[in-house]
Regions:
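Sequence/structural signature of beta-propeller domains
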Residues: 33-403
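C-terminal motif of bacterial Sec signal peptides marking the signal peptidase cleavage site
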Residues: 24-27
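Bacterial N-terminal signal peptides that target proteins for export
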Residues: 2-18
Length: 403
């Protein structure tokens, strides 16, 4: 399918997310990890303004009363990617799909697949292991050619996953992505388990950055989906204790933010628990610039976003989403020193907002249905079997409910 037809076929959306009823998810408990290291951050009182949550899409009857739409394919959603004029693309870890939604919850996957009930398939590895997609990025820079029915085309949306693969979709790919790189179990004991993905440029060249939790590293790929040999840094911080490995990653304001989680005994997943997390800032060549946050309120952190003007009084603060306890913590940058912890994001009823199985945090891009002051999120609640895609705005009325 031609991508231009996808854009022009989309209905014009003028409604804003902020007018929809609020939903605040009840806080979940801590994970199975130990108490972790004591924080080197000084915790300030939680921010005073309140925020409201709207569940836009879910696969579960647990949020039918508040979600605008129900989509059975939205199972443990992780990464969110967005491009101007296009829907949000979401990586559905359990269903091995990508599904598309507007900023007000309209299901738009049918613009690609022809049916709202059919997602874009993310293929298994050569060994037949499911992709279980996690991170996802939009590529607007060219390169990253993949085969389609009309020859080689630039991949527009790129995915990585726990199956150790990098998959990609181009404008004429139809209802399935293709595998562009495979480092799954067929590669042996050191196969990759990718948990996050970012895209950025160094000296005019574009690269992908994939966090490999299994092997404690960040894999870098050039526009041919090959690993360059001349990258300066190795995304290493000697001040992070052994056992903590790259987990989430985000390109923000010209830097790469990498979250570190405690690796579990199977070397496949993160351990959760209070204080189990670190966040570093690297340049796009992999050189450490500074450690941003350390232990304290961190609990398997994954999602990262920078608050824009209009998001309460938090402009310029970093919002860090904990997978472990579902909270969104506010950090005020402090130069190259550790950031100041300002407290959790609060609902209008004075309670911390928390989403069991919290993954992505992404602000809108300014499209009519994606306000820049709305914080969109994904979460895989019910022990990562179900999913919700929603948005958070400054609260106008104190009407949160739980699920």
């Amino acid at each position: 399918m031609n991508l231009h037809r996808v854009i022009t076929s989309r209905a014009s959306v003028s409604a804003q997310l902020g007018i929809v009823c609020a939903l605040t998810v009840a806080a979940c408990g801590g994970g199975s990890g130990s108490g972790g290291n004591s924080s080197s951050l000084s915790a300030a009182p939680p921010a005073a303004m309140g925020f409201a949550d709207t569940a836009l899409v879910s696969n579960s009857g647990a949020v039918v009363a508040t979600a605008n739409k129900i989509d059975a394919n939205l199972q443990n959603p992780w990464g969110i990617a967005v491009a101007p004029g296009l829907p949000f693309w979401i990586s559905d870890n359990n269903s091995n799909l990508s599904t598309l939604y507007s900023g007000i919850g309209a299901i738009e996957t049918q613009s690609i697949t022809g049916s709202a009930n059919v997602g874009i398939a993310i293929p298994a590895s050569v060994a037949g292991v499911q992709a279980n997609p996690t991170g996802q990025v939009y590529n607007g820079n060219g390169g990253f050619l993949i085969p389609t029915g009309n020859g080689q085309e630039t991949a527009l949306f790129i995915f990585d996953g726990e199956g150790g693969t990098i998959a990609a979709w181009a404008a004429d790919s139809g209802a399935a992505a293709v595998t562009a790189y495979d480092d799954g179990v067929a590669s042996g004991a050191n196969h990759a388990v990718y948990k996050g993905l970012a895209i950025g440029t160094v000296g005019g060249a574009t690269y992908l950055y994939a966090t490999d939790l299994h092997n404690n590293k960040v894999d870098v790929f050039d526009t041919n989906f090959t690993k360059p040999t001349a990258m300066q840094g190795k995304f290493v911080d000697p001040n992070i204790p052994a056992g903590f490995v790259p987990f989430g990653i985000a390109a923000l304001n010209g830097d790469l933010y990498v979250t570190f989680a405690k690796q579990d005994a199977a070397m496949h997943d993160e351990s959760t628990g209070a204080g189990l997390g670190y966040i570093d800032i690297f340049d796009f060549s992999g050189n450490l610039k500074s450690q941003f946050a350390s232990a304290g309120s961190l609990n398997a952190p994954w999602g990262i976003a920078i608050a824009p003007a209009g998001f309460g009084s938090l402009q310029g603060d970093l919002l860090i989403g904990n997978f472990g306890d579902g909270t969104i913590n506010i950090f005020s940058p402090n130069g190259t020193a550790l950031a100041n912890f300002e407290g959790p994001l609060m609902s209008s009823n004075g309670q911390p907002i928390a989403f069991p199985g919290l993954w992505s945090l992404v602000f809108g891009n300014g499209d009519a249905d994606k306000p820049m002051t709305t914080l969109f999120y994904t979460a895989g609640f019910a022990d990562q079997t179900d999913g919700v895609f929603g948005g958070i705005t400054v609260a106008s009325t104190p009407t949160p409910v739980g699920y």
